[in-house]
Regions:
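Mid-domain alpha/beta scaffold segments of enzyme catalytic cores
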Residues: 1-266
Length: 266
């Protein structure tokens, strides 16, 4: 069974000093490829280095982007460095994660409005870069689904190159993405007892567009919820999703891996 974790954050494991063990556990669990997701200039070169180390088998791929929670008054300098990363080898497989996040805004209204304005400007700038590069876009949307959709509509980005990672909206919202050509990808939240709306969204989108992710070290699937997440645990989400779609785990792994490779063009 060959699994593809489309969204993880390996920086946390590198900082902790246990990245080699985490990668080995992922291999043992059947993970053939993982994409470590850039959030800002501090992790871009680390991730390019990891992708270079694994260039032979493509086990680790990487993206470059400025996460909305990394946006501050200096966002323009960070975003200005993104496009040049596509001239380096190995090249990023997507731009992101980028988007909008209302959840982590400060409580003070004026400060929140100022930061959200920076997020919108940084997102628009990154969408423009993605359009120029014809790169896939990994979108972070939390408490700002309608705004993210509207900004992508206005950007001219090809919706077929857009994934809303860690999809937590419902069937109606994923329908908004799908009718435009975009997709959502799913984390261990899918396994949570209270996540009926997320499961409904996955079913509404269908197996033919389903992609898996861990978002490690966050959002650990059952039965390990409460512990730090890691790429190996994508297997638990895959097995749960197989039951949801009424297929074997091997078939779920095959289709979701094909979907991920097709979306990223690898």
């Amino acid at each position: 069974m060959e699994l593809f974790d489309t969204h993880t954050h390996l920086e946390s494991f590198a900082r902790r000093g246990d990245l080699p063990a985490v990668l080995e556990r992922a291999r043992q669990a059947g993970v053939a490829t993982m994409v470590t997701i850039g959030t800002g200039p501090d992790d871009w070169e680390l991730y390019r280095g990891l992708a270079a180390e694994h260039a032979g088998d493509g086990f680790v791929r990487h993206t470059v982007g400025l996460h909305p929670c990394s946006v501050d008054s200096a966002w323009e300098a960070a975003v200005a460095g993104i496009e040049a990363r596509w001239k380096l080898e190995p090249r990023p497989v997507a731009l992101g994660e980028c988007g909008l996040d209302r959840f982590h805004l400060p409580k003070e209204p004026e400060e929140a409005a100022r930061i959200f304005g920076w997020q919108q400007a940084a997102f628009a700038a990154q969408l423009a870069i993605a359009r120029r590069l014809d790169a896939p876009v990994v979108v972070h949307s939390r408490g700002a689904f309608a705004e993210c959709v509207a900004m992508i509509d206005a950007s001219g980005v090809d919706w077929r190159r857009v994934v809303f990672h860690c999809f937590t909206e419902g069937a109606a919202e994923i329908g908004e993405l799908n009718r435009r050509g975009g997709v959502g990808s799913f984390t261990g939240i899918l396994t949570y007892k209270t996540a009926e709306a997320v499961r409904a969204a996955a079913l509404a989108q269908g197996l033919e567009r389903f992609m898996l992710e861990t978002d490690a070290p966050y959002l650990t699937p059952m039965p390990h919820r409460g512990k730090p997440n890691e790429p190996a645990f994508v297997r638990h989400t895959a097995e749960f999703a197989a039951g949801l779609f009424g297929v074997s785990p091997a078939e779920l792994a095959r289709v979701s891996t094909e979907n991920a490779r097709r979306f990223l063009g690898i």
